[in-house]
Every structure is written in structure tokens, then in C-alpha cells.
């Protein structure tokens, strides 16, 4: 009501150059997002997982995103349609929030489809146990669909990248590596549906299957931790620290350099439609 009351006091500006510039920048940004997501990675680019979700996002979805790289991809890539609700980990720092957030959303709105976006670190912290709660209650829901996307990159990836960019330190494997775990098979074992994807050409079809499922789904995306979570433009200081980390002998140096070059090229090289 307050905004509507202000409308009569607004003056139309004939000079639309600033608006056109913003619109052009937004179009360029979404082109860049898609091009980066379509770049290959070993075994799978996490950006592709979120891009394919964004294309299929139902209006009844409730998205929850955990602390970590899932919050980065959620914030950059997913286009929120009218009606879609979303929630991030409080303060963007509390690991393990996305799974219980999604479960709570399902109890509050049983006819909607919560989609939890979490990493393997948070899933191992408390998410696996929370799935037992889902297994107990899902048959009581009017719509049984709830999806738990797990980025399985075997790494506490957000902190790994923060160490490289903010401190110039290489990845410390003893603190950053986490055990590989069969999330999809675990889901199957407790009566849920498990879907595991490690090839880009299978991602879209896997989302279609998850969104049409007749029970809760654990969507395990076996992704690369080498894809940089950096924005398209970084400061000189960040670039210096990144280079320093690699010079000190990062164990994932080859993959990190390869993916960083691909991401930068997507922002520098001409677009396919230009």
C-alpha cells in the first residue's frame, strides 16, 4: 500500500539509457551463468545441476540452501518464479540447516514440494539422521514429494576455496577431505528413492524423475570440487592469494587451474549468439 501511494508522485523519465544498460547487463549475466554451467568438469559441474533445476522449478517449490557452495549456486543460478519460497542457512554460516528446514517446510505445507540443496559435509553432519525422520512420516503427507539434493564432491568445498582466495593457502587435505558415501543407496535402504548422477547429459532427466516421484528423493550429484565459486570478476588481492595457494602446492592444482580457466573464458570469449 505504501508503494502504491507513492506512484502519483513519480515522474516519467524520457531518458531510458540507464534502465537499458541495467537490462543489458542482466541479459549478459544470465548468458554467462548458462555458459559456465555448460562447461565440462570431472565428473560433473555443480552449476549444471542447479541450471537444470532452475529450468524445471515448479511454482509450488520451497527451496532451502545450506551453508557452503550450495548457497553460492542457489543464489547465482536459480531463477525464483512467482509463488516459490526460499530459505538460506541463518547468517549464511550454520551448516546442517537445509535438511531440517525442508522437513519443517513439508510439515507446514504438505501440498508443496520442498527442495533441499546441501553439500556432503552438511549431510554427513546431521542430514543422514534427519532422513530417518522423513522415512517415518512421509506416507502421512498428502503429497509425498520432497527432494534432497546432495553435492557429493568429497570436500568441505566452501572453506577450501576460502583458504585459497582469502588466505593464499592450498587445500589442506587432512581437514578438508571427507569420506565418500553412497547417499542415493542409503536413501533406497530406508524406503526413499535414491537417484545418483555423474554425467551432465543425465542431469535434466534425473530432475524430471525426482520431481515426478511418488516418494521422497535423495538426488546425489557426484560433482567436482574444482569448479571455482568465484564471481566473474575478482579483486587483484584475491587473484594474488589464489595464485599463492597454487604455488604452494595445492593437491588439486591441475583440476583447479583447468576449471578456473574455463570459467574465466566463459566471461571473456564472445557468446555463441554474438
List each model region and its residues.
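Glycine-rich, acidic loop regions that bind phosphate or pyrophosphate groups
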Residues: 1-22, 137, 141, 163, ...
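Conserved thiamine diphosphate
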Residues: 1-2, 9-12, 162-209
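Active-site diphosphate/adenylate-binding microenvironment
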Residues: 25-109
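Hydrophobic, well-ordered secondary-structure elements that form the walls
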Residues: 53, 65, 104, 120, ...
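Glycine-rich beta-alpha junction loops
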Residues: 67-69, 152-155, 222-227
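Thiamine diphosphate
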Residues: 72-156
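Short glycine/proline- and charge-enriched loop/turn segments
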Residues: 80-85, 162-171, 238-240
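Glycine/aspartate-rich loop-and-adjacent alpha/beta segment that forms the canonical ThDP
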Residues: 209-274
Amino acid at each position: 500500500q505504501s508503494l502504491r501511494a507513492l506512484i502519483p508522485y513519480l515522474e516519467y523519465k524520457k531518458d531510458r539509457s540507464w534502465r537499458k544498460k541495467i537490462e543489458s547487463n542482466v541479459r549478459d549475466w544470465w548468458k554467462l551463468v548458462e555458459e559456465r554451467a555448460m562447461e565440462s568438469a570431472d565428473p560433473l559441474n555443480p552449476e549444471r545441476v542447479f541450471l537444470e533445476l532452475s529450468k524445471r522449478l515448479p511454482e509450488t517449490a520451497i527451496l532451502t540452501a545450506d551453508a557452503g557452495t550450495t548457497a553460492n549456486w542457489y543464489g547465482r543460478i536459480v531463477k525464483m518464479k512467482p509463488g516459490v519460497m526460499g530459505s538460506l542457512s541463518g547468517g549464511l554460516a550454520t551448516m546442517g540447516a537445509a535438511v531440517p528446514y525442508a522437513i519443517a517446510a513439508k510439515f507446514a505445507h504438505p501440498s508443496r514440494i520442498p527442495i533441499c540443496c546441501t553439500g556432503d559435509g552438511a549431510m554427513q553432519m546431521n542430514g543422514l539422521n534427519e532422513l530417518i525422520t522423513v522415512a517415518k512420516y512421509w506416507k502421512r503427507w498428502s503429497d509425498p514429494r520432497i527432494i534432497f539434493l546432495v553435492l557429493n564432491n568429497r570436500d568441505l568445498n566452501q572453506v577450501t576455496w576460502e583458504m585459497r582466495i582469502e588466505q593464499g593457502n592450498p587445500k589442506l587435505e587432512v581437514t578438508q577431505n571427507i569420506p565418500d558415501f553412497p547417499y542415493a543407496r542409503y536413501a533406497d535402504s530406508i524406503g526413499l528413492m535414491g537417484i545418483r548422477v555423474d554425467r551432465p547429459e543425465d542431469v535434466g532427466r534425473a530432475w524430471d524423475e525426482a520431481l515426478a516421484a511418488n516418494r521422497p528423493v535423495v538426488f546425489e550429484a557426484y560433482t567436482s570440487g574444482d569448479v571455482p565459486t568465484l564471481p566473474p570478476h575478482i579483486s587483484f588481492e584475491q587473484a594474488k592469494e589464489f595464485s599463492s595457494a597454487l604455488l604452494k602446492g595445492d593437491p588439486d592444482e591441475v583440476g583447479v587451474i583447468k576449471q578456473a580457466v574455463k570459467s574465466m573464458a566463459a566471461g571473456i570469449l564472445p557468446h555463441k549468439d554474438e
